[in-house]
Structure formats: C-alpha cells, structure tokens
Amino acid sequence: MPGPSDDPTEIALQGNLFSDAEPTVSATGVEPSTACEAFSDMELTADAASRPRRRAPADHNAADHDSNTDESSDNSDDPAWAHHSQVDPQQLTPMLRHYVELKAAHPERVLLYRLGDFFECFFEDAITLSRLLELTLTGKEGGKAVGRVPMAGIPHHAAERYCGELIRRGFSVALCDQLETTPAKGALLKRDITRVLTPGTVLEEGMLSSRRNNWLAAVVIEPAHRDEPFRWGLASADVSTGEVQVMQRQDSDALHQQLAQLGAAELLSSTPESNPAWCPDQLRLTSVASTPFSRPAAEAALLRHYKLANLDGLGLPELPLALRAMGGLLAYLRDTQPLEENASVPLEVPAIVQRGDALVLDAQTRRNLELTATQRDGSLQGSLLWAIDRTLTAMGGRCLRRWLEAPLMDLDAIRQRQQLVSTLVEQRNLRQALRRLLRPMGDLERLAGRAGAGHAGARDLVAIADGLERLPQLAARLEGTIIRGPDWLDDLLQPDPALQDLASSIRHTLLESPPLSLSEGGLIHDGVDPLLDGLRNQLDDQDAWLSQQEKQERQRSGNSNLRLQYHRTFGYFLAVSKAKASAVPDHWIRRQTLANEERFITPALKEREGRIFQLRARACQREYELFCTLREQVGALAASIRRAARAVAGLDALTGLADTAASGAYCAPELVEGRALSLSEARHPVVEQLLVETRFTANDVHLGSGTDLVVLTGPNASGKSCYLRQIGLIQLLAQIGSWVPAAKARIGIADRIFTRVGAVDDLAAGQSTFMVEMAETANILHHATELSLVLLDEIGRGTATFDGLSIAWAVSEHLAGDLRARTVFATHYHELNNLANERANVANFQVLVEETGDDLLFLHRVSQGGASRSYGIEAARLAGVPTPVVQRARQVLDQIEAAA
C-alpha cells in the first residue's frame, strides 16, 4: 500500500518504539482536514451495504526501510564538547537546545533523539554510544558560537537491537520520538520522551530472555540500631508477566541470600551506600529518591495503581517496609512507562511470601549444585536446568526455573505435583497429545502484558487468539484424568468464558497474517466495519480508474509499453522508455529522468492522486481505530489471560518433567514426614547425560534413620564431589515434585541444603582460601537444623595439617551431635574414620579404587568402610606431573611414613 503523502494536513503520528509510528486515534474518528469531502461517513456506509465485501485473508509484508545519514564523519579522538553541561544552551541551535533540556531531566540515561529515520545522540552520550556499539562518531553543527558537537546515531528500524545491547550492558535509555510528521510553520517538529527503557522495565521481546523472569526489585532498609535488628522489606515485579511478590524479614545475610535467589535485572534503593554488603555483586543497583519510599507516598501509589479505597485487603499494612518498597517500585514504573491512553501496566495484586514457603538455598549452594548455570563458564549446558528442561513454551521454561530456584516445603503441595507427573509418565499417549498442543503456543503471559500496556502489535493479538483457542483442547485432554491437582490448574480446566469470546473477536477482526506496521492498513478483514468497507470500495473504484487511465494514455500516446506506476516519494506517474519520451502528448508533465526511462504526470492523474491519498489515509486511520479498540479489549482481560497462561506454563513444566522421567529411568520418590533420605542406585542427573562412552555408576545413600553423618573417604578424582552433588540435586528434584534418577527413593522434606565444595581466594574482600572456607563453614554451623542437608567437601585444607584436622573433627562432632543435621562429609583426613567408633549416628564410606601395579582404576563405587589411602601421588602421575617429580614424591612419602 502506498506510503503517506506529503500533505501538511496529514494525521499526526504517535511515538512508537520499534515499528512504524502509530497514527493518533482522534475522538471523532477522522480529522475533517483529512476526510475526502466527496464521501461522508453515511455515504460510505451505504456504499458498503450496497456492495458488501467478503473476507479474503491475505499475507502482507511490512516494508523494511534503510536510510543513511548525511552527516560528515569526524574522527577526532577528543571532541570539543564532551559533555552537554559544558555548553551554554542559549548558544545552541533550537534542536540541540531541546536535546540538552531533555538530557538535563534524564542525566543518568542515554538519550536517543529521533531525527527522521535515525535516533541520534549528542555530547557524552554520542561518545558512549560510539564506543560501546562500535559506531562512527560524527558531528553536527551546534551553533555559530559552539561549532560542531559530537554525534552518533542508530537507524530507527534497528533501534530494538541497539537498545537491547545497551540494556544488557546495564544502561538505561530514554527515547525521544517525533509526535507529528509536519511541524507548524516556523516551528520544530514536536518531540518528547515517549519511553524510558531500563533493565527491569523492558517489555520488548528482543530485550528479554524468553525462559527466565525479568525481575524489577525495590528494597527498603532499616539498619540495626541499639536493640533493634537489621530489618528489610523487598518488593519484586516482572513487568512483562505481571507477577508481583513482597516480603519483610530481618538479617542482612537473609537479604543477600534472597537477592541472589531472585537475580533481579534491576534493584531500586534509596540507600546512600554505593556498594552495600547486603547487595550481591552481580546485581544492578539503581539509586532513586527517598520520597517515593515514604509511607504516605507508597500508600498513595498502591491505592492509585490498584484502584482501591484502602489497603486492608492486601495485607500490607502489617508489613510496613514491604509496603514502602512496593510503593517505590510503582512510582518508578510510573516514571519509566509513558503509556497509551486507556492502557496500564497490568500487575497482579502483590503475593506475600511467607517464611518457610520454600527450601532455602544460599548463593554458595546454588553455585555448587549448578542449578541454572555451570561454575566453569556460567553456561546453561551442564546445569541441572539444562538436564531436566523439556518444556516447549517460554512460559513453561520460566515456570520450571522458578520451581528449581524455590523448591517447595509443603508436603501436600509436593505430592500434588508428583501425582500429576506420575499420571503423565504412565499415560504416554496423553503426555504426547498435550505436548503437541503446547508446542506452537506463544508466550501468553508477556503478550497479554504488552496488550495491557498498549504496546502489542497485530501479530501479538493473533498469537494470543491462537493460544486461547488451544485452552479448551488442553482441558478436554485432561478431563477425567486429573482427580486432584493444584489450585492453579483450575484456571485451565475452568477458564474464564470471556477468553473464547475474545479469541473469536480477534479472529473475526484481524487477518491471519497481518503486517508489522499498524499505520499502513492491511490489518482488518473485509466485512468487519461498514465505514472501512465503504472506503475500500471507493479505493477499488480508484484502482479501476487508474487501470482505465493507463489504457487511455497508451492509446493517446500510441505507446503500448507505457506503464502507470507508483513510488512512495513521487506518487503516481507514467513511465516510458527514453526512445519514446520525445513523442509523449503535450499535456504530460515531466516528473523525473532516469538512465533508461522518463517519468511523467498529467493534471488528471495528479488530481486523482490527492483523492486516493485521502481515501487511503482515512482507511488506514479507521483500521488503526478498530485495532486499538480490539487491543483495549485484550488488555482489559490481561489478568484472565495470564491466569490461564500460568496454568499452561505449569502443565508444560509437568509434562516436561514427566518426559524426562520416562526417558531417563527415573523413579517416583516416596515422600515422607521426618528426616529420612534413602536412595538406592542413585545417579547424577547431569553427569549421566554428559557421559558418552561409559555408563554412570549408581550408588546408594541412607541418612536420617540411624545415620546422621557419613564420613566419605577415597582417592582424589574418584567421584566424591559428584556423589555429594547428586544427593543434593535429588533432594531438590523431589521437592519440586519431580521423579528422581534412582531405582528407589524415600525422602523427607529438607528446610535447607548447605554445600561447601571447593573454595577460592576472595582477594577483593581480603580473604584467603582458608578464610573463605571457614566463613562458609560458620554459616552452615549457625543456620543448619536437624531437617537440613549438609554436603561438605573437605574442611581445613588451607592451614597446618593438625589445625585442619582438629577443625574438621570438631565440625563433624557438632553436626552429628548438637545439630543432628543429615551430613555427608568427603575428606582426606582418614583419622575422621575414628568418629564412627565414638558416635552411633556416624558411618564410614569410601569410594573404591582398584590397584594393578602402578595403575589405578577408579571404580566410582561407594562402599561401607573407611579408606586408608588417598593415592594422591598416583593421581598426580595421571594428571601429567613429570616422572622425576612423581618418583621424588614417592621417596619423600616413604621417608615420612618411616619416621612416623
């Protein structure tokens, strides 16, 4: 469809980020200045009634526009004006003066300023942009007294990619877009900030990880004072999915642990500290004003956002710090999310996270167990999530990740999940049928959020309709097979009836494959709106006139090769070859000369062109109005869509776990009250998948029923650390409701899992390896209970041998005696085997090895009894230590043993 005309009365455009700008929806439909005066709305409606249009879905491809800047390059390494504050704004050109005014309001953000087909930035932002994104640093004339100022820019059509890179690097971006296409006489184009992008508030699909939540968090701190402990309130929201949760606790370590678990993309705080101890190093801390975090401002923000008369129903008045954090978060959202009219960021009512809802996993344990990323390089492959994730949808992937990061402690809830997994394992046909329905589903959670915020495109709405239409099919498959399931499953089995009506409305209104652009038409089916049909009938008449005109001009000119064509810049024209150009009729007017052809217009063609442009503008405007109405309908049901989406996500996670269990020879663990942890032929869920040429050696473990501490000895590199980790991973898998890699399992619920596996220097904190190891051990001894699972891989290695042995012995005694925590302690201190002679709840186990001459064969088999040797010298030889060094080591060992 032709592009917009150059008519100065053309409809104003709204700023819209990464697609063509959307036309403003006026209150009366079409501005009088743009209406084709020959056809009133009544006449067009009557035309549609007399010539009804039939639905004819068709594919439309959005045009991709590439443009080049005309600014000259400036390769200076030291720009004259490296910061906007160095310049007197009154000496700048009007455009740059406006830029500096906006920059002063957003000094902490990269300001991108729309100029034609580019987003440009100037001064320090231009320097930053050119360095980070490897763009050419150019210059622009800033005024007679200023000269050229630094400039860098990105094409409008590539803005999402470049902004996404800035967001990933931790920057926030303010976008200033054009709010009109033609300025008033003697004035600049109207521009303003239309969107602020920050790591925690983005909604664009290309800037989000599809399979993990993008949390924005806010924290309020009350430091310890006299007899008052350190207290904190935390609010977190995923703007893209609408999930909101709040909590209030004590203890800075608990806050550090919670923030590490959450992994927020952005953390808001009004604390003056630049690097507080309670904030994990990897988090992005955004400093904000303290006013929005005050109690009155926070209450007002909550009442306004949720449209409430009071806050009693939310349960937040009893959590004053969490309430203040939530208010500050909402204020930040309001400042960074300029929304379309009748749109809002659809956030759920805050869910209060209670203490004891989830198994506690500190940051060290998460790293050691490699739940979602490997320790070596932080990649997904090789993690537990990689090994068990068979989900088919993005929302299902996020759901499974949340389950892994916060395993349940409620035995009934765990059993409900496990029963569903068992049903899906046993009923293979049901599982496969559900997975076929799940595979093509879009991300309903985030699509609904974009619709509610007024950012969704036509293709987003079509994807929503497709997903909603699958809900009854999923429910029908589950009917009769689910006896008792979690409450969230009801949103799938008994969905909101309005959702199917909404899907039908989307299908009735939108083409199956609409274009990306919302401003150029081609969105709406024929037969949906009489006024639109009338406009399309008139456009068909104009097309017929153009076809007839081409035939007439061919006859008049005697040129059978003449073509009537259209160009977005030049409009309609008659094209003839160079050879025929001299014989054209006198009433033709030369429009353009090319290498091989000449282009002409006629007065009649020019007059008709204006009428066609007016009709097209009205038709496109009407399509946009109809689309916006439909988008508002979708946004109004965003909460219902998301509830259904959460149920689909949970079902996807369960079917994925069932698929993993069915293909991996897993078993359904017997979940019991108490402290039992009994595993037969248990395997490491990740390592067994990584092995190619060998089979994983399964092993048993029995804790909590007579034995509370296992002292595990054996050679270096024999598999002790793997054994420890597999026990922790199986405990965790059981508490998310999954089957586990074992022949048989009987598992009680753990309140925490602690690991101390390896240690490295923390040079930044001035701590040696030994001090890091002792700090981790102290944390375990302070917080472990008889319901905890403790996995220790060596203690006391970084100091003198007897000091280390003494510490290891005392720690073991405390764990087995005072705490009675279920513990597996892997060590090379063979003296610890004597603990079993002193305490009935301590048992010795070893990893077997087979000696054949100078060679060692690691059997990876765990057996009762303590090892007497570590075979460290043999392990050194296998690692490639030079032979003379190995031989000398044996001589020294013989001397030491003889002296002993």
UniProtKB/Swiss-Prot annotation:
GO BP: mismatch repair
Region (Disordered): 1-88
Keyword tags: ATP-binding, DNA damage, DNA repair, DNA-binding, Nucleotide-binding
GO molecular function: ATP binding; ATP-dependent DNA damage sensor activity; damaged DNA binding; mismatched DNA binding
PROSITE patterns: DNA_MISMATCH_REPAIR_2 (PS00486)
Role description: This protein is involved in the repair of mismatches in DNA. It is possible that it carries out the mismatch recognition step. This protein has a weak ATPase activity.
Xref: NCBIfam families: mutS1, PRK05399.1
Protein name: DNA mismatch repair protein MutS
Organism: Parasynechococcus marenigrum (strain WH8102)
Lineage, top ranks: Bacteria, Bacillati, Cyanobacteriota, Cyanophyceae, Synechococcales
